Amino acid sequence: MKIYLVGGAVRDQLLNLVVKDRDWVVVGATPDDLLSQGYQQVGKDFPVFLHPQTKEEYALARTERKAGSGYTGFICDFSPTISLEQDLSRRDLTINALAQDLDGKIYDFYGGLTDLKQRLLRHVSPAFAEDPLRVLRVARFAARYHALGFTIASETRELMQQLSQSGELSNLTAERVWLETEKALLEPHPEVYFQTLQEVGALQVLFPELAALQGVPNPAKYHPEIDTFVHTMLVLQQAVLLTENTDSDKSAVRFAAICHDLGKALTPKEILPHHYGHEKAGVMPTRRLCQRFKLPHAIQDFAELCCEYHSHIHKAFELRAETILKLFNRLDVWRKPERFKALLLVCIADTRGRTGFEQVDYPQREFLWQLYQSALQVNVQDIIQQGFQQQAIRDELNRRRIIAIKQTRAEILPRFTNPC
């Protein structure tokens, strides 16, 4: 029985990156061999075991043979005669098909070391095309290692295009697509994930609402990048920068960033490049997207709010106190202040996600937050103690909040609109 460290741990170690998870392959052993040494079996379809002390995963070496459609139709063989080379042959990319024995020796049967040096994401074998999920995985690795200069090998890109055109992507479950996408949203460059899917033809299959933004123009005065898909990717980049060191729900903010302008794909051609009413128009495609991938209600609600109200927030200085209160009530800022903060981050990303506007200030955030704080000082208990009942309590609460917002707005607006 021989044990090897495999996959991402070896890859990241060689890239001088922090190793987060360590996976092991066991060659020349049976399930009984590991069980007798105290390992705990957790895999059903093929034996995966947890180490009795470290709880790291140890899998018996195996081969896989395609026996159906999608990413689940595989027959596994995990007999003790399976070699390390055979096991590594089923990996997706050469840089993931590296192994290291307990003495530190590296095993590279498929050119992974060379591809690491050349910063290439290359498939191990033609069997890559048997699993459509690998299109998303490669796009995610491109998003992860973009800053290190990694690119996708041309022959691998061709296979990804073939898979995208084959209809195999439609066999992927919504949950699996979202799992890969959510992981990609948390990578350093998630925009590369979506750009890669677009380039190989997968975006149109999996995210048609987002793909529809390609070629939709914006006014050059406000959007020098013009193309709405390009703008959306720039907004996503900014959302990453704004959330990387915050407590905000990163995946929710970044997902909302890619949804915020979906309504622009529905703009009548005769009024382009203007997009009157795109905010409300974007709610339905966002809802369809969320429901198709069975996303949590909190993520869907947040994305829809970002679609419908981001322009209100951009125009905060123009809004009357009554309108601001309606906005606060619709956003439920009283019970969900953290969601309000996150929405403001999406609005900042939207403003900065334009060519040449990456460093602009966004005073609307502080302005609205101060108005929210002033309205928050209105005490509902005081209203109740003064004898108001039922609907009259709500009406009086709104009236007093409007007064508070008006007063604070009058005091601070000149400072924001005439900073000199």
Swiss-Prot record:
Record GO biological process: RNA repair; tRNA 3'-terminal CCA addition
Which cofactors are required for activity? Mg(2+); Ni(2+)
Record's cofactor remark: Magnesium is required for nucleotidyltransferase activity. Nickel for phosphatase activity.
Name a Pfam family for this protein: PolyA_pol
Q: Give the Enzyme Commission number.
A: 2.7.7.72, 3.1.3.-, 3.1.4.-
Q: Which GO terms describe its molecular function?
A: ATP binding; CCA tRNA nucleotidyltransferase activity; cyclic-nucleotide phosphodiesterase activity; magnesium ion binding; phosphatase activity; tRNA binding
Q: Enumerate the residues binding Mg(2+).
A: 21, 23
Q: Does the keyword Nucleus apply?
A: no
Question: Anything further noted?
Answer: A single active site specifically recognizes both ATP and CTP and is responsible for their addition.
The free-text function statement in the UniProt record for this protein reads: Catalyzes the addition and repair of the essential 3'-terminal CCA sequence in tRNAs without using a nucleic acid template. Adds these three nucleotides in the order of C, C, and A to the tRNA nucleotide-73, using CTP and ATP as substrates and producing inorganic pyrophosphate. tRNA 3'-terminal CCA addition is required both for tRNA processing and repair. Also involved in tRNA surveillance by mediating tandem CCA addition to generate a CCACCA at the 3' terminus of unstable tRNAs. While stable tRNAs receive only 3'-terminal CCA, unstable tRNAs are marked with CCACCA and rapidly degraded.
Q: Of which family is this protein a member? A: Belongs to the tRNA nucleotidyltransferase/poly(A) polymerase family. Bacterial CCA-adding enzyme type 1 subfamily.
This protein is called: Multifunctional CCA protein
Q: Which organism is it from?
A: Pasteurella multocida (strain Pm70)
Gene name tied to this protein? cca
